[in-house]
UniProtKB/Swiss-Prot annotation:
One of its GO terms (molecular function) is lyase activity. It catalyses: (4E,11E)-2-hydroxytrideca-4,11-dien-1,2,3-tricarboxylate + 2 H(+) = [4-(deca-1,8-diyl)-2,5-dioxo-2,5-dihydro-3-furanyl]acetate + 2 H2O. The keyword Lyase applies. Monomer. Induction: expression is induced under low pH conditions. It comes from Fungal sp. (strain ATCC 74256). Pfam families: MmgE_PrpD_C, MmgE_PrpD_N. This is Alkylcitrate dehydratase phiI. Belongs to the PrpD family. Pathway: Secondary metabolite biosynthesis. It comes from the Eukaryota. One of its GO terms (cellular component) is mitochondrion. Phomoidrides A and B (also known as CP-225,917 and CP-263,114) are potent inhibitors of Ras farnesyltransferase and squalene synthase. CP-225,917 and CP-263,114 inhibit Ras farnesyl transferase from rat brain with IC(50) values of 6 uM and 20 uoM, respectively. CP-225,917 inhibits squalene synthase with an IC(50) value of 43 uM and CP-263,114 with an IC(50) of 160 uM. The keyword DNA repair does not apply.
Amino acid sequence: MQEAQVDVKVQSTKTLVMSSQYDKEIAAVAHYMHNYHINDRTTYQKARISLLDSLGCAIETVSKSAEVRSLLGPAVPGSKIPNGFRLPGTSYVLSPVEGAFDMGILIRYLDHNDALGGAEWGHPSDNLGAILSVMDWISRSSAAGIFTHNGPPMTMHTLLTATIKAYEIQGCYQLLNAFNIYGIDHVVLVKLASTAAVSWLLGLTEEQTMAAISHVWMDGQPTRVYRSGEDTIPRKGWAAGDACMRAVHIAFLVKHGQPGSPGALTNPRSGFYVKTFGDKGFQFARPFGEWAIRNVYLKTMPVEGHGISSVEAALIQRERLQERGLGLKDISGIDIRTTAAANLIINKTGRLHNAADRDHCIQYVIALAFIKGSPPEPEDYADDSPFATSQEIDALRDKTIIRPDEQLTRDYLDIEKKSAGAGMTIYLEDGTTMEEVLIEYPSGHMSNPKTKKLVEGKFERNMRLKFDDGEIMRIKDALNEDSMRVHEFLDLFVRKGQPGSPRL
């Protein structure tokens, strides 16, 4: 498998001849987007699975979340966009900018889409909000003869290629660059990867793509405050959509002639490094290639990714309790050893204020698993859920201790192993201890042999919320039609007369 030999560590002369003035990190992303060729069939098959999973998540969200439905649709009710993006699961027709926001929300909001860890964490499928909206608009507009397109063909093969490359850009940045240390939210990498992908899709030159990427680093970046403690709010569910929307807007601005700033990262007075990230700049463990799409974690339950191992461990321990004729009242303590990332992101004590707070609390999802005997569902986090005010939930949360474990953290950060481990030990009221259950590769992890079947089942369950079996089969078949136009593919997801509620 070919690996891109141009990255931020090693630059070829050819890369810099055209625009040596652009920061090397900016040039590397643009070069990869425009010049790297993917020939491996397995890589494309992984992309098909990720695309199906993401579209299933979108249908689940539009079906289950009234809160999300209130955010969908044109900003100005009744506005019309000729040949606009057809938002899956609805009858909305949107501009590619607004469509990127809405599609980004649908994929991300219920925290059921894929994930990838590292020094930074994130969700590479977030980028599909930008990719799908732009490709659909280009495909329809060029077919109607109202837009002259000079970029790659708007086919399923191109969609998969853009997906693979967006995943790779975001994933390689996540491995060693901890934006969270600086209070920056990980959706900055969605903006980066989506800007690169959309620039290529729109037919921008490599030079113009560098200009667009420079605008990503000139932007003020969103902070993690909306994911933090009592300040956690639903914005964490639409932050990726916001990043997609901005990426599309930037690419269009550059398409219409706006220049970039070559030193957006390294300008000694005002660059991103000196003002935000530190003099050492970005670090990279590997060159851009096809690594991320092959290692992404496909969630089989709507739980923040770092907590899924703990949920699975809880279900096993619950079964052991029942085998011994014991119940939850017999538990005196629950000890969880897990990764430093899990401890930082989802270890929450005290009052939980809303659904966004609950779905990012490891103690809450563990308690849910013990009480229900099954993984959490999106409705379990809602304010009107009986679990939201359950004293039994609170009692189990109070008994749960979370400890970051050095070995599990090393394995999580190891680029070759990439486990997502958690170990759970149960202490009983009679003074005895139940043996630890250790889950290193939970369902959804590419190293778990059950993942493929579980993800396919997840897709079909989600799709049945709005589609019949015949329609689902047609969608799955279409995914293998490399020459199919993207707008023809997305037409399969339209639900007439189901727009939801327009945002005001």
